[in-house]
A protein has these predicted regions:
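N-terminal secretory signal peptides that target proteins for export/translocation
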Residues: 1-9
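Short, hydrophobic alpha-helical membrane anchors of single-pass surface/secreted proteins
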Residues: 11-14
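Bacterial N-terminal signal peptides
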Residues: 16-28
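Hydrophobic single-pass membrane-insertion segments
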Residues: 27-35
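Carbohydrate-interacting regions of secretory-pathway proteins
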Residues: 34-300
Length: 300
């Protein structure tokens, strides 16, 4: 009888405890939900944010001037084409004395990761130039024209081609192969990333962010804007601020503060981790290409 009484008493105590726990839960859960709701509604503390200051193209803190504005000391190019004029490195080509495609090379080293900025101006409708970087000083490649293309060429075109080949041999000492930040008077190609002297040719058009990998077609990662919209920021016949950033496999071209093209180059067959800096001149007719305020900033 005593055992039965204890059993009943235990059941009573257990039921009381269960009721107490259930009641506490009913009270606690809404309270916790109320606190969570208050926390969700409570505004987060405002994070301080300051707009980044625009970079001043003329701020040279941490940069090295690689053209003194007076002489071609440290630069190597044919005097037939290149000289200093009004504080600028100037390349000239005329109908009577064409330059062909040739370069003036900075002999101060082979930078790997860096920023390079220069002001450029092109004069003459046929003017075509660019900034070579991470480039190689190699003999010119023989130009091979398919027979069917050769058969379609006029005598004038054949003569120009023959003249170009002769000039390439004459100025072979300054032949360059590698990445080029392109610049032409008509701004058809200005801002694009062109690879001079290799089968790749144009790698990233103006307005494109492109990635290359071994054995795969080039991939368009993003568009930076339409080619025509970006072209509107380029000033024909005037000074333009051109900046090249080479950091690891990432290459960026900027003109007058606007990103023109980006390449992420991971193709080991073509990617160059360091090399020469040079300015190119080419084109037909009377033309002039000027470069001033040339500054280099090496990156880690």
């Amino acid at each position: 009888m005593q055992a039965k009484s204890l059993s009943s008493r235990s059941r009573l105590v257990g039921a009381s405890l269960a009721c107490a726990v259930f009641t506490a839960a009913l009270i606690y859960i809404p309270a916790r939900s109320h606190v969570a709701a208050q926390q969700a509604r409570a505004p987060r503390p405002a994070s301080p944010f300051t707009q980044p200051d625009p970079i001043d193209f003329n701020d040279h803190d941490g940069w090295t001037q690689i053209f003194d504005g007076k002489t071609l000391n440290g630069w190597d190019g044919t005097p037939d084409v290149w000289h200093v004029e009004d504080g600028a490195i100037v390349g000239v080509s005329t109908t009577q004395h064409p330059s062909g495609t040739t370069n003036i090379i900075w002999r101060g080293g082979e930078p790997a990761n860096f920023k390079l900025k220069v002001e450029m101006k092109l004069e003459g409708a046929g003017a075509n130039g660019g900034i070579q970087y991470r480039s190689l000083n190699v003999p010119p490649r023989p130009r091979v024209i398919p027979p069917e293309r050769l058969a379609q060429m006029t005598d004038e075109q054949k003569q120009r081609m023959k003249q170009g080949e002769a000039l390439a041999q004459k100025y072979a000492k300054w032949n360059i192969q590698g990445y080029q930040a392109d610049f032409d008077y008509n701004n058809t190609y200005t801002g694009q990333l062109y690879e001079q002297g290799t089968p790749r040719g144009i790698v990233a058009w103006r307005g494109q962010m492109v990635e290359t990998e071994a054995g795969k077609p080039h991939r368009l990662l993003a568009t930076l804007g339409s080619s025509d919209d970006l072209k509107a920021f380029i000033k024909p016949g005037e000074w333009n601020q051109y900046e090249v950033i080479a950091d690891g496999n990432t290459l960026v071209h900027i003109i007058n503060g606007h990103v023109m093209s980006i390449l992420i180059d991971t193709d080991p067959k073509y990617a160059q981790s360091k090399g020469l800096i040079a300015f190119e001149i080419e084109g037909g007719g009377d033309l002039k290409i000027s470069h001033r305020n040339v500054w280099l900033k090496k990156l880690p």
